């Protein structure tokens, strides 16, 4: 009888990552889009991290050297933002600061697609996007409908693996079931709630949380998985007491704060969330 293959991400590692985030309060530099700055900062604060929206061309590189992690989100892009993002990513790469690329709406628009592909040269620790964005970034698709995906996560698995090989980092594809890949490993994370898709900035906040976890966890697959699990548990708990988008958004931030390492551990013992 053949031995059962070990799980690519042991559940105890995710609970340990949650505890580490709380204990270490990483400083996360966010070069993110103007639509989502408030919810992104609030999500980081709720999770126990410290946000810093240092995104100008004069300071982005210097701050990336002292930050615990960096988020680069190309959602609202112009020439100055693109330059600041490039400088921050290069600085993070040189300083070995973990950084996350969120290729918002990449694939269908030439400018942001070129900028995002250029950023890959700075070896992001994690790329996090929906299926259409990952396909577009890898050159295997033409993008989705704006920020919304027109493809399922499973359709982007091979593109994600190719991006992971190219960058050396993990790639996380969001969907009904999220698919995460790195170094020959593939992990699926289920759960969450449909109200996340009706909350402006929920996905962008997830990218910031991936960065926060990458600051306290050296394995990029574990870091990405910890963020996805944290967000999913918080969303399910929020939806249990808030049935509409406005109240859900507030409840979700509350639950990001409430979900601690013990909650992660208890959930993973019974939920079957990981596959």
Swiss-Prot record:
Belongs to the Thz kinase family. It catalyses: 5-(2-hydroxyethyl)-4-methylthiazole + ATP = 4-methyl-5-(2-phosphooxyethyl)-thiazole + ADP + H(+). One of its GO terms (biological process) is thiamine diphosphate biosynthetic process. Transmembrane segments: none annotated. This is Hydroxyethylthiazole kinase. Substrate binds at residues 53, 201. It comes from Kineococcus radiotolerans (strain ATCC BAA-149 / DSM 14245 / SRS30216). Pathway: Cofactor biosynthesis; thiamine diphosphate biosynthesis; 4-methyl-5-(2-phosphoethyl)-thiazole from 5-(2-hydroxyethyl)-4-methylthiazole: step 1/1. Its cofactor is Mg(2+). Keywords: ATP-binding, Kinase, Magnesium, Metal-binding, Nucleotide-binding, Thiamine biosynthesis, Transferase. Catalyzes the phosphorylation of the hydroxyl group of 4-methyl-5-beta-hydroxyethylthiazole (THZ). It comes from the Bacteria. GO terms for molecular function: ATP binding; hydroxyethylthiazole kinase activity; magnesium ion binding. Its EC number is 2.7.1.50. ATP binds at residues 128, 174. Pfam families: HK.
């Amino acid at each position: 009888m053949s031995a059962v293959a070990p799980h690519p991400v042991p559940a105890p590692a995710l609970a340990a990552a949650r505890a580490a985030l709380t204990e270490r309060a990483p400083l996360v530099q966010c070069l993110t889009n103007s639509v989502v700055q408030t919810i992104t900062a609030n999500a980081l604060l709720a999770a126990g991290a410290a946000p810093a929206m240092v995104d100008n061309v004069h300071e982005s590189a210097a701050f990336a050297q002292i930050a615990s992690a960096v988020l680069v989100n190309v959602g609202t892009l112009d020439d100055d933002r693109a330059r600041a993002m490039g400088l921050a990513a290069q600085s993070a790469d040189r300083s070995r600061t973990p950084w996350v690329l969120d290729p918002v709406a990449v694939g269908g628009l030439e400018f942001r697609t070129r900028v995002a592909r250029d950023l890959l040269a700075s070896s992001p620790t994690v790329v996090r996007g929906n299926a259409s964005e990952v396909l577009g970034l890898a050159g295997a698709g033409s993008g989705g409908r704006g920020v919304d995906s027109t493809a399922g996560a499973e359709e982007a698995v091979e593109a994600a693996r190719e991006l992971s090989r190219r960058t050396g980092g993990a790639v996380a594809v969001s969907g009904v079931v999220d698919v995460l890949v790195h170094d020959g490993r593939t992990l699926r994370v289920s759960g969450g709630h449909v109200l996340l898709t009706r909350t402006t900035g929920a996905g962008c906040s997830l990218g910031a949380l991936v960065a926060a976890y990458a600051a306290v966890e050296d394995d990029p697959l574990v870091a990405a998985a910890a963020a996805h699990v944290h967000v999913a548990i918080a969303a399910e708990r929020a939806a249990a007491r808030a049935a509409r988008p406005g109240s859900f958004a507030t409840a979700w931030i509350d639950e990001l704060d409430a979900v601690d390492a013990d909650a992660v551990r208890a959930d993973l013992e019974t939920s079957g969330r990981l596959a």
